[in-house]
From Swiss-Prot:
Belongs to the peptidase M24B family. This is Xaa-Pro dipeptidase. PANTHER family: AMINOPEPTIDASE (PTHR46112), DIPEPTIDASE YKVY-RELATED (PTHR46112:SF10). Mn(2+) 2 binds at D223, D234, E341. It comes from the Bacteria. GO terms for biological process: proteolysis. The gene is pepQ. Gene3D superfamilies: Creatinase/methionine aminopeptidase superfamily (3.90.230.10), Creatinase/prolidase N-terminal domain (3.40.350.10).
Amino acid sequence: MNLDKLQNWLQENGMDVAYVSSPTTINYFTGFITDPEERIFKLFAFKDAEPFLFCPALNYEEAKASAWDGDVVGYLDSEDPWGKIAEEIKQRTKDYQNWAVEKNGLTVAHYQALHAQFPDSDFSKDLSDFIAHIRLFKTESELVKLRKAGEEADFAFQIGFEALRNGVTERAVVSQIEYQLKLQKGVMQTSFDTIVQAGKNAANPHQGPSMNTVQPNELVLFDLGTMHEGYASDSSRTVAYGEPTDKMREIYEVNRTAQQAAIDAAKPGMTASELDGVARKIITDAGYGEYFIHRLGHGIGMEVHEFPSIANGNDVVLEEGMCFSIEPGIYIPGFAGVRIEDCGVLTKEGFKPFTHTSKELKVLPVKE
């Protein structure tokens, strides 16, 4: 179905050939994903000919056995891949003048190699915006995978909370989370590098886990996600290890209130900027606006960051079927940081999260 949309777009826009270069986008159109490393892995679609998947011989049998039921063309390391691509295209069609290229995944070296095979062709049309647009709206089968990834994230939080004890490093907690995901859930890939930040480290939103040790009576921020059959989860929770101070409780409750208000307000027809403003106003009115230093959210799907961007000034209208995060944060340098994040799908009834770990402030007991 997705590939039909691409072929229809080619016909409507007077394009002869589509060059799809990102492994994630190839997965979207074919149901097959692999890491080709330095080798060539591409999808070619045509306005009036059958598409084909081009891959290393190492991946040929895997591709043939995948959900992709179209042609697969493999090549050996000893062969010239670009010459073989050109030969395959010229056998399929005489129309290869006008190309639509996924420029977001195109390297200069690959463009030069392709242009050398088709020196008279026009490669100026960008396919990236069309791909981003159709990926905005998730099908029910995609939502099933996103919900499953959310369940895995909820499991990971419980492992992380249980791993906290005096003197444990942030990295050791991460290792426990990722080990148990593999052992108990069969999760072989996280959607990004797992973040665990204790105390003042949590005031640096995207700082990775360090050898910093967890100490009693501080906040600990978790930001984590998994890949489930090619679809990502991404969720954040902040907990207290030991008894938090009144100030810690205050910033937590302000942030939790802002996040829940945005979840409750989200509906089709409002703009991304309006939704961002719901949470931002609450945090600003509480006196912490200067510490909310990022957008409210981002799209999610086959990649952990997709469109739409839920940001101040973005007037894109939110529609049913869009999936995105709602994740306000308050980060006070030298003190603490709080982020609470859920990804979900926008329906006519509102925003439906994929993760369900409680957002009441969890005060964990101190353990030796």
